[in-house]
């Protein structure tokens, strides 16, 4: 967990992919802040990604976590309640400065003591170590700090005895058009892994989960938005209609737009609009033209849609 721009969703997705690839069952729950452009370090701007992995069938994302990553003071303040009494907590001490603690409404300069945290805490200067790791890459400070999530991911991969090769392949594919970004992230993820190995960070909380090789072609990694997109395609096919999506990109609804845009060969038409009202308006127009038309929103757009409500007599 961390700020919206800390890349928690990406780190969670990569760890999920790594775990699924080695044969673990997974269930995930991405958690996005309700605020639009919440102030950095604020309590209302915390974003998180929950991953539940196991050797046997996993049915839910789980209630309490064994490992909690808090990239700043606000994340620790809001997410600590989800940590088990035996959990391991990872924090970036560079983001627990006086100003960070003030934003998170801490009253003292020792949040661990103030919250009465008894669990093991891996307190690492993640931000500084990332900058040291990438010092010779020529990247600016802002670009380097965007890799903080990969350091935390590398440390978590060490705790769970995960092979980094799968994570490397994921990053190379995601940043195929920007190989320098892929290499920077790969370098940092190894730095996080090595930090855990060299310092034996929280040896009491290393995990080994039995892996079971899955039969190729039988299983897939799917999230709710992707399943929703497939449902739209199936509904249009059964209705004998073309599928139209008018959408404004806004997290997390953007995933539906991204997925449907891949399936033009199946008669899917997607339009990216400048705002959510436009997205809804194009869908209404497409429905009058005979298409199965849908629009998406992460929530706030629902209010905007009322402006397009047609009066009836």
Give each language-model segment a name:
Residues 15, 282-283, 306:
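Aromatic/hydrophobic pocket-lining residues that form π-stacking "cages" and hydrophobic walls in ligand
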Residues 299, 313:
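Conserved AMP-binding A3 loop
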Residues 45-47, 272, 285, 308:
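Flexible glycine/proline-rich, aromatic-decorated loop/lid segments
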Residues 1-239, 303:
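Active-site cofactor/cluster-binding pocket
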Residues 95, 250, 312:
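Short, glycine/acidic-enriched loop or turn micro-motifs at the edges of active sites
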Residues 211-284, 288-296, 302:
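Non-catalytic terminal/interface segments that mediate subunit docking, oligomerization
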Residues 306-312:
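Conserved small/polar residues in nucleotide/adenosyl-binding loops
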């Amino acid at each position: 967990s961390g700020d919206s721009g800390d890349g928690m969703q990406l780190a969670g997705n990569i760890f999920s992919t790594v775990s699924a690839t080695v044969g673990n069952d997974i269930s995930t729950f991405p958690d996005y802040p309700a605020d639009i452009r919440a102030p950095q370090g604020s309590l209302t701007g915390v974003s998180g990604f929950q991953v539940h992995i196991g050797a046997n069938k996993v049915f839910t994302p789980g209630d309490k976590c064994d490992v909690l990553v808090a990239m700043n003071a606000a994340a620790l303040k809001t997410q600590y309640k989800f940590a088990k009494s035996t959990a391991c907590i990872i924090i970036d001490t560079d983001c627990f400065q006086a100003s960070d603690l003030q934003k998170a409404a801490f009253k003292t300069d020792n949040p661990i003591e103030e919250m009465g945290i008894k669990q093991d805490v891996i307190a690492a200067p993640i931000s500084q170590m990332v900058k040291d790791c990438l010092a010779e890459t020529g990247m600016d400070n802002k670009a380097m700090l965007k890799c903080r999530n990969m350091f935390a991911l590398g440390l978590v991969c060490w705790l769970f005895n995960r092979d980094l090769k799968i994570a490397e392949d994921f990053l190379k594919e995601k940043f195929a058009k920007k190989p320098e970004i892929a290499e920077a992230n790969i370098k940092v993820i190894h730095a996080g892994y090595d930090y855990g190995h060299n310092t034996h960070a929280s040896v009491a909380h290393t995990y080994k989960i039995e892996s079971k090789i899955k039969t190729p072609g039988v299983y897939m990694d799917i999230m709710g938005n992707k399943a929703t997109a497939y449902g739209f395609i199936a509904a249009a096919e059964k209705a004998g209609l073309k599928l139209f999506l008018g959408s404004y990109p806004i997290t997390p609804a953007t995933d539906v737009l991204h997925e449907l845009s891949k399936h033009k060969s199946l008669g899917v038409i997607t339009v990216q609009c400048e705002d959510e009202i436009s997205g809804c308006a194009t869908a209404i127009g497409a429905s009058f033209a005979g298409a199965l038309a849908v629009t998406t929103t992460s929530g706030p757009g629902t209010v905007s849609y009322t402006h397009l409500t047609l009066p009836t007599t």
